[in-house]
A protein has these predicted regions:
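S-adenosylmethionine
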Residues: 1-225
Length: 225
């Protein structure tokens, strides 16, 4: 979470990092001290669903807890251990975090939402549901240089691990479980596995220079003034 402040008459960004794990915050503080960036950082050990700041923020980044199915290139066991129930449980938690965090964003502020999940239920559908329920928010298309081949038609960023894509031309006919190289990647293990793969291939979302990357999803929303 970030808000604008003033220091010696100069506008500066003030970052508040909230995490339920004190251990992860210790690692963050250690890194920030090494980089000499602690002066503008406040850390808070709290549950994201109960944290209530005294001031609102201009930017909020939600690195949401998720099924982590996008990391299966490095952790192939995930596709054998994760279930549809795991995805549904994370989807419910993500929705609650989004709704709570939205209360603390200033008008015109930006809300960024990110997961390392391949499931649309934790990405595209999660955001579409949110903006339907919260019409004071709108999608702010991500147009950063270098992301041209990673953008969806809605303005989100969606990246898939390279091995998730077939070696054949990216057509719906070739985007099968067999060609994706994961026969166990089924709707039983991950809802929308087939359709996610098809949608991503159709939109041309895997850039050649992203080889070796995990799968992830990013959306940017803006609160209307």
């Amino acid at each position: 979470m970030c808000r604008t402040g003033r220091q010696n008459g100069t506008a500066v960004g003030v970052v508040t990092a909230v995490d339920i794990s004190e251990q992860r915050l210790d690692v963050l503080r250690e890194n920030m001290m090494r980089l000499k960036l602690m002066q503008n950082l406040t850390t808070v050990c709290a549950d994201a669903l109960s944290y209530t700041p005294s001031e609102k923020f201009d930017i909020i980044l939600i690195d949401a807890p998720c099924s982590a199915t996008g990391t299966f290139r490095r952790h192939p066991e995930i596709m054998h251990t994760k279930t549809a129930e795991d995805v549904r449980r994370q989807e419910k938690l993500q929705r609650s975090i989004l709704q709570h965090a939205a209360n603390f964003l200033t008008p015109g502020g930006m809300l960024l939402y990110a997961t390392c999940s391949l499931a649309k239920a934790e990405g595209e559908r999660q955001i579409k549901h949110f903006i339907t329920e919260h019409q004071e928010f709108a999608v702010f298309p991500i147009t950063l240089a270098g992301t041209e081949n990673l953008r969806t038609k809605e303005g989100f960023i969606r990246v898939l691990p390279q091995r998730f894509l077939p070696k054949q031309p990216n057509t719906d006919e070739n985007m099968t479980e067999k060609n994706m190289g994961r026969p166990n990647l089924t709707k039983k293990n991950m809802p929308d596995a087939d359709q996610t793969g098809k949608d991503m291939a159709r939109a041309g979302l895997m850039a050649e220079n992203m080889a070796g990357a995990d799968g992830f999803f990013i959306a940017c929303l803006q609160r209307k003034i």
